[in-house]
Design a protein with these regions (language model features):
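Extended, Lys/Arg-enriched charged tracts that mediate electrostatic binding to polyanionic substrates
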Residues: 155-215
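Catalytic nucleophile loop
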Residues: 320
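Active-site- or binding-pocket-proximal scaffold segments within functional domains
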Residues: 143-150, 156, 165, 169, ...
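Short, surface-exposed "cap/lid" segments of acyl-processing enzymes
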Residues: 202-256
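Structured beta-strand/turn binding interfaces of compact recognition modules in eukaryotic regulators
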Residues: 124, 129-140, 147, 157, ...
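Serine hydrolase/lipase
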Residues: 2-125, 142, 225, 259, ...
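Beta-strand elements of modular eukaryotic interaction domains
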Residues: 198-203, 209, 216-220, 300-304, ...
């Protein structure tokens, strides 16, 4: 109620009556009125026509004071005070720093000083990219009774909206779906279906991720145009078999333009990344060809507009392996350059991997090429009780003495693996909200990792 409205209502009220002008009204006895509906705030503040100026003013002031007190009590009642909410408020406060700090969060200094204690801005960004990876699981159709088993359940243009991810829907637009297959003679993923189902969307292809680009509004918040690539983890039987193909293969043999034949990666991962089926319209091109074409197109478009561009690749489990392999391939193939050629004065789009619970991908020479010569950054989020990051290369890995590893690689032993990037190790047993269990899959769960980050 404004002062002008209050003055108008008070001026219309009669002054205090005197003895000479007092009148008496005969009141008839009637039945008690029915209960009235609760009055709204606006109606409670209306002045009675028979009230006097002084009484009305006192009543109004008292009612306003009561309403203010009630509002303050309600604010105190709903004010969050737990540690998690405090961290979220701190992260929101630091969001304004992201345009100036995005290269640091993207690993320009290998996250020095940001992991212990965890930087609140890095924490929020890790959770955000982890949710982009989780979306691959939530959108995958793994129902064997579905005619579209192995595909994505939602259309590309409504991907995040249909998943109920409004923040991601406002922040990113999916530009391409990614599909993969394998040419090994393994039992078909759809082996439980009869031949009468030959008209299924695809007998051999599987939807395995997507490429998205930040919107104009999100790019302003991030401080650059971000190209996000999310890879799905292991769900189907076919991919489990690929996980178990435990021997190294030179990447140059698979068409990746690496000048060093000693750079090797796990064979099952690279097969899933490079295999294709010309008879299938979804896998006519390999996952590698699909992602490189899309990244080149987006980088060329936005660098031509004079924007800073970053490439952020994320994935969980098998998706982590594909994320590391594709990030390496993008840098090795110069897909992060506007003209696709390594020339003086041309700036590369920064490439970073946010990996969750991923296995080792390549040998020691792959790590050297990945980190040192190409400058790709990787932050690996792991659970110390999860066995997947320990494989492959349980005995011969980056943890053995350098001399032993060099001798093993010189003898061309096929089980010498090395992790890439920086590790952020978490422990689910330190969380009071997660119960300890004998199921090893719980330690590998992506949502558990995101909870531990939060």
């Amino acid at each position: 109620l404004s002062c002008r409205d209050l003055s108008a209502q008070l001026s219309s009220l009669p002054h205090r009556a005197t003895a000479a002008t007092t009148t008496h009204t005969q009141i008839s006895l009637r039945r008690a009125p029915a209960p009235r509906a609760p009055l709204t705030t606006a109606k409670r503040l209306q002045l009675p026509s028979a009230a006097t100026r002084d009484d009305a003013l006192a009543s109004l002031v008292g009612q306003l004071e009561q309403n203010l007190t009630q509002d303050e009590e309600e604010d105190d009642l709903y004010l969050p005070d737990d540690a998690s909410s405090a961290r979220r408020r701190a992260a929101q406060k630091h969001q304004d720093e992201l345009p100036a700090r995005w290269r640091e969060i993207h690993g320009s200094d290998d996250w020095a000083g940001l992991l212990d204690p965890m930087d609140p801005l890095l924490r929020s960004e890790l959770i955000r990219y982890g949710e982009l990876a989780q979306a691959c699981y939530d959108a995958f159709d793994y129902d064997l009774a579905s005619r579209y088993c192995g595909s994505c359940k939602y259309p590309r243009r409504a991907f995040f909206e249909r998943l109920g991810m409004p923040d991601a829907a406002r922040g990113y637009a999916v530009t391409r779906y990614l599909y993969a297959t394998s040419n090994f003679r393994f039992p078909n993923f759809f082996s439980g279906r009869s031949r009468a189902d030959a008209k299924l969307w695809s007998q051999r292809a599987n939807w395995i991720g997507y490429v998205a680009v930040s919107t104009d509004e999100e790019s302003a918040r991030l401080g650059r145009r971000d190209i996000a690539i999310a890879w799905r983890g292991t769900i189907t039987r076919l991919e489990w078999v690929s996980d178990l193909m435990d021997y190294l293969r030179p990447v140059a043999d698979e068409g990746i333009p690496c000048p060093d034949p000693e750079v090797k990666v796990e064979s099952g991962f690279v097969d899933l990344y490079t295999d294709k089926d010309p008879s299938c319209r979804f896998c006519k091109y390999s996952a590698r060809e699909q992602v490189l074409v899309e990244v080149r197109k987006l980088v060329a478009h936005y660098t031509a507009l004079g924007e800073d561009v970053s490439i952020s690749v994320t994935g969980h489990s098998l998706g982590s392996s594909l994320a590391i392999l594709s990030a390496y391939d993008i840098a090795e193939s110069a897909a992060n350059l506007s003209n696709g050629m390594i020339t003086m004065g041309v700036q590369r789009a920064a490439v970073c991997v946010y990996s969750f619970s991923g296995p080792r991908v390549g040998n020691g020479r792959f790590r050297e090429r990945f980190e040192g010569e190409l400058g790709v950054k990787a932050l690996r989020v792991t659970n110390v009780h999860d066995n997947v990051p320990r494989m492959p290369g349980i005995f011969l890995n980056e943890g053995v003495p350098e001399m032993v590893r060099r001798v093993a690689e010189g003898l061309r032993m096929p089980w010498c693996y090395s992790h890439v990037g920086v590790e952020l190790a978490l422990d689910h047993k330190r969380s009071p909200f997660l119960k300890d269990t004998l199921d090893p899959g719980c330690s590998h769960n992506l949502e558990a990792h995101l909870h531990l980050l939060d």
